[in-house]
Design a protein with these regions (language model features):
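Intrinsically disordered, low-complexity regulatory segments
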Residues: 1-170, 174, 443, 482
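Conserved short loop/turn motifs at secondary-structure junctions
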Residues: 1-3, 111-112, 189-194, 268-277, ...
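Basic, low-complexity terminal or inter-domain segments flanking catalytic cores
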Residues: 2, 25, 82, 89, ...
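Amphipathic alpha-helical transducer elements in NTP-driven molecular machines
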Residues: 9-16, 33-36, 40, 59-62, ...
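Short strand-coil-strand connectors
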Residues: 30-32, 227-231, 414-418, 675
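C-terminal or mid-to-C-terminal helical accessory/interaction module adjacent to the motor/catalytic core
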Residues: 88, 143-228, 268-269
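Metal- or metallocofactor-binding catalytic centers and their adjacent structured scaffolds
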Residues: 244-279, 285
C-alpha cells in the first residue's frame, strides 16, 4: 500500500478521487492500494523554550540556543498554563503514524513549495519514519494536473536542499524571535514585546515612513500653464517650478501683455509599451489592494479558494513567467475565455495566431509559474472570488496581446526667456490596452510626479521656429508632497523590493532579487503586526500604533530592524536551496547574531514606566492586573474582567486612567459596530464596574457592551 499525504482534506479528496481511494475512514481515504491522508497544515513545530528547561523570561536563560532543535506536535495556548499539544493535531498524527507503518512507500502531496516541504519533513522526522518517499509536484489541482503529476513523480531526495532552506528559515525565526522578544521584554521590565526576524524590519519600514510623512514640511511652489490653439486644437504647455509667487505673478502679467511663444525644439518618438507579465502572488495582492481595497491576506485566501476549486493554478508563486511546455496550453485557455459570455468581447481582441510570448522564460520560473486560469471555467463564484478570477483571466489576455504602440511628442517652447514644455501622446495601436483590464497606468503616474501635466493630450503639428499664440495664462499653486503613508499595496511592494530602497549601491546589488519575506508569507507578516497591535489600518493606510512606535524607537538603530540584513538572510536561504551555501554555516552565523543581539538588548537602559494602579471597581480591594488585551482582578472570587479592545479601538493606559478616575473616557472616534458601520462615543463606567457607551448627541442614550 502507498500513502499519499496532502496538506488539506479538500486536496486529499481530489487526489483520492483520481487514484480510486473512495472508502472513507477516520482521517483518511482508502482504496485501490492507496491510503490518502492529510496534514491539517503544520501538525509539527519547533518546541517552545519550556522544552529546553527555560520556563518564563529570565536573564540567565539567554540566549537560548537549542542543539538540536526538538520537534513537538502543534502547540495551542492553555489558560494560565502556557501551551499544550493540539488534540486535533495529536489525533491526526496518530493516524498518519499508523498509515506510515503499514505502507511500502509515501507520496508527498503537500503544497509544492518551501513551507509545504517543511510540513511533510517535520512530520516524517517527528514520527521517525524511514519509508521511501516520492514528491508530487504540481501547479494545478485539475484532474489533468494531478494525473500528469502522478505519472511524473520525483524522488524525494531531489528536494533535500529545499527542505534545508525551509528548516533553516524556521530555526532562524525561532532563534531571533524567541531570544529578542524575551531580551527586550526583560529590559523593559513589564509586558511582552514581540520581535521577529521579518516582522521587525517590516514594522520599522511602516514607522519610518509614518515619521517622514508626519514631519514633512510642505513648501509651496508655482507653475505657469499656458493655453494655445493651432488647427482648431487646444493644447497646453507648462513651466518649470517657480518658488517665488511674486515672480510667477510678474511673469503672468508680462505674458498676458506679450502672448507669443516660439517653438525651440520638437521631437517625436514611437514607443512600444510591452504588455504586463502574469501576476505572481505579491503582484496580485498589490493590485487587489489598490483597486478593491482587499487586504493581502484576504486576496491570498480568495486565491487559495479558487485554486482548491480548480479554477486557477497554485497561488503562492513568486514568478511572473511560464515555461515553454506550459505555453502549449495557453491557446486553449484563450479559447475558453473567447467562448464565455463574460469574457468574449475582450478575449476576441486577442489573435490566437500571433500570441505574445514575452512571458515565456524557463530560467525565470521558480517553484511555480505565474498565475493562470485552468481549463475549468468557474460557476457560482462569490463576488470577491469573481473579482480575483477576473483579474487573473484579464491579465492573461493582456500578457499575450500585442504591445501598445504610442507616438510620444515633446516640444519645448520659449516665451520671455522662459521655457515651457509641451508633452503629448497619440495611441497608434492600442494592443494590450484595448483589453481594458486591471493594469495601472504607470506612465500617467510618472507624469504627475514630474509635474509635467497634460502628458496625454493630442497635439497638432508643431514646427521648430514657429510662433504660437498664447490664449490664456494660469498660475498653478502647488505644494511639495510628503512620502505617502504605506497602503498594503505599497508595503507589499517595499517588502518585495527591499534592496532597491537602499542608498548604498553595493547593498542594492547584493540584495537584487531578495526581499523581506516571501510571496507566501508577506500577508501573514502584515496580519501579525496588526494582531499584535503594532500597526493599524487608517482608511487605506497602515500606520503604527503607540505601542508599535515605542518598539521602533527601541530597536531602530539595531540590526534586527535593518532591511538590508533581513534581505541578505533571504538571499542566503535561496543560496541554501540552490546548493551554494552550507546550511551549517548559516546556522552558525544565526547563532552568533542571536548572541550579539541578546547581549545588546540585555544591556539596554530603558527608563521604567510608572505602573498604573487602578483599584478593582467591583470588589474595591485588589488592584487590577493590566495586560495587553484585558484588565482583570487578581481575586478569582471577584472575577472582574475588562476587555481592552472595544469595537476595534484599544483602551490605552491613558484611557483606562481617565475612565477609572473620571468615570468617562474622552470621545473615541471611529469605533466599529458588528454591522461594520463606524460611530463615535464616550465609554462610561457604571457603579458596578460595567461599562456603557454614551453618545455625544444623545447623552442619555447608553448601551451596554
Amino acid at each position: 500500500m502507498k500513502v499519499i499525504l496532502a496538506e488539506k482534506p479538500s486536496v486529499a479528496r481530489e487526489i483520492a478521487a483520481i487514484v480510486g481511494a473512495s472508502e472513507k475512514q477516520d482521517g483518511y481515504l482508502l482504496g485501490n492500494d492507496y491510503a490518502v491522508t492529510w496534514a491539517l497544515g503544520h501538525l509539527v513545530q519547533l518546541a517552545l523554550p519550556e522544552a529546553y528547561g527555560c520556563v518564563g523570561f529570565h536573564r540567565e536563560h539567554l540566549p537560548i540556543l537549542p542543539r538540536p532543535f526538538i520537534l513537538v506536535p502543534k502547540q495551542i495556548p492553555e489558560d494560565k498554563k502556557g501551551y499544550r499539544s493540539d488534540p486535533m493535531a495529536l489525533k491526526q498524527l496518530k493516524i498518519i503514524d499508523s498509515l506510515f507503518k503499514k505502507c511500502s512507500s509515501i507520496i508527498v502531496a503537500t503544497d509544492a513549495g518551501r513551507e509545504g516541504e517543511l510540513i511533510f519533513r517535520y512530520i516524517y522526522e517527528y514520527l521517525q519514519c524511514q519509508k521511501p518517499f516520492q514528491r508530487l509536484w504540481i501547479s494545478s489541482l485539475t484532474e489533468k494536473g494531478i494525473k500528469t503529476g502522478l505519472a511524473n513523480l520525483q524522488e524525494g531526495s531531489a528536494f533535500d536542499l529545499l527542505y534545508a532552506s525551509a528548516q533553516k528559515r524556521s530555526e532562524a525565526d525561532w532563534l531571533v524571535g524567541i531570544n529578542a522578544t524575551q531580551a527586550l521584554s526583560i529590559a523593559v521590565g513589564e509586558g511582552i514585546y514581540s520581535l521577529g526576524r521579518v516582522q521587525t524590519p517590516t514594522l520599522a519600514m511602516v514607522c519610518k515612513r509614518f515619521l517622514e510623512h508626519t514631519h514633512f514640511q510642505k513648501k509651496p511652489f508655482y507653475q505657469l500653464r499656458l493655453k494655445h490653439q493651432k488647427s482648431y486644437t487646444d493644447f497646453f504647455s507648462i513651466s518649470a517650478k517657480i518658488e517665488d509667487k511674486k515672480e510667477a505673478e510678474a511673469l503672468q502679467k508680462q505674458l498676458e501683455k506679450s502672448p507669443m511663444a516660439e517653438v525651440i525644439s520638437t521631437e517625436k518618438e514611437v514607443v512600444k509599451e510591452q504588455p504586463p507579465l502574469l501576476y505572481d502572488l505579491t503582484g496580485l495582492q498589490k493590485e487587489a489592494n489598490k483597486k478593491w481595497n482587499f487586504s493581502a491576506d484576504e486576496t491570498l485566501q480568495i486565491a487559495q479558494s479558487l485554486y482548491e476549486q480548480k479554477y486557477i493554478t497554485y497561488p503562492r508563486t513568486g514568478s511572473k513567467y511560464i515555461s515553454e511546455d506550459v505555453w502549449e496550453e495557453i491557446p486553449q485557455l484563450i479559447r475558453l475565455l473567447q467562448e464565455s459570455e463574460a469574457y468574449a468581447n475582450e478575449a476576441k481582441l486577442v489573435k490566437i495566431g500571433a500570441l505574445n510570448k514575452k512571458m515565456v522564460n524557463d530560467l525565470k520560473v521558480t517553484d511555480h509559474h505565474g498565475l493562470l486560469i485552468t481549463e475549468r471555467f468557474p460557476t457560482n463564484l462569490t463576488a470577491k472570488e469573481n473579482t480575483i478570477y477576473k483579474m487573473i483571466a484579464t491579465r492573461l489576455l493582456e500578457a499575450v496581446s500585442e504591445p501598445c504602440v504610442k507616438e510620444v511628442q515633446k516640444t519645448l517652447l520659449e516665451a520671455l526667456h522662459t521655457d515651457f514644455l509641451v508633452k503629448g501622446v497619440q495611441v497608434l495601436q492600442a494592443g494590450w490596452r484595448a483589453i481594458g483590464g486591471f493594469y495601472s497606468d504607470e506612465t500617467a503616474k510618472d507624469s504627475e510626479k514630474d509635474n509635467e501635466g497634460d502628458s496625454n493630450q493630442v497635439l497638432p503639428e508643431l514646427v521648430q521656429g514657429e510662433s504660437i499664440k498664447i490664449k490664456a495664462v494660469e498660475i498653478l499653486s502647488k505644494t511639495t508632497q510628503p512620502p505617502a503613508l504605506y497602503t498594503e499595496s505599497g508595503l507589499l511592494g517595499a517588502m518585495e523590493t527591499a534592496g532597491k530602497t537602499l542608498e548604498d549601491k553595493a547593498q542594492r546589488e547584493l540584495l537584487q532579487g531578495a526581499g523581506i519575506g516571501t510571496p507566501a508569507t508577506r500577508a501573514a507578516i502584515i496580519e501579525t503586526l496588526l494582531k499584535r497591535n503594532y500597526i493599524e489600518r487608517k482608511q487605506k493606510s497602515l500606520i503604527p500604533t503607540d505601542k508599535g512606535m515605542q518598539v521602533y524607537q527601541w530597536v531602530k538603530s539595531l540590526t534586527i530592524a535593518d532591511v538590508a540584513l533581513t534581505g541578505e538572510w533571504e538571499s542566503q536561504l535561496q543560496k541554501i536551496e540552490q546548493g551554494e551555501l552550507s546550511p551549517d554555516s548559516f546556522s552558525s552565523d544565526m547563532e552568533a547574531y542571536t548572541r550579539s543581539l541578546t547581549d545588546t538588548f540585555l544591556a539596554m537602559d530603558i527608563p521604567q514606566k510608572e505602573k498604573l494602579k487602578i483599584t478593582c471597581p467591583k470588589c474595591r480591594n485588589a488592584s487590577l492586573l493590566l495586560f495587553e488585551k484585558v484588565a482583570k482582578c487578581p481575586d478569582e472570587d471577584c472575577g472582574y474582567v475588562l476587555f481592552r479592545n472595544v469595537c476595534g479601538k484599544p483602551l490605552t493606559d491613558e484611557l483606562l486612567k481617565t475612565l477609572f478616575e473620571k468615570g468617562k473616557t474622552p470621545l473615541i472616534k471611529g469605533m466599529k459596530s458588528k454591522s461594520g458601520s463606524t460611530f463615535d462615543a464616550y465609554i462610561c463606567l457604571k457603579e458596578n464596574g460595567e461599562t456603557a457607551f454614551e453618545f455625544p448627541e444623545k447623552t442619555s442614550k447608553k448601551r451596554k457592551y
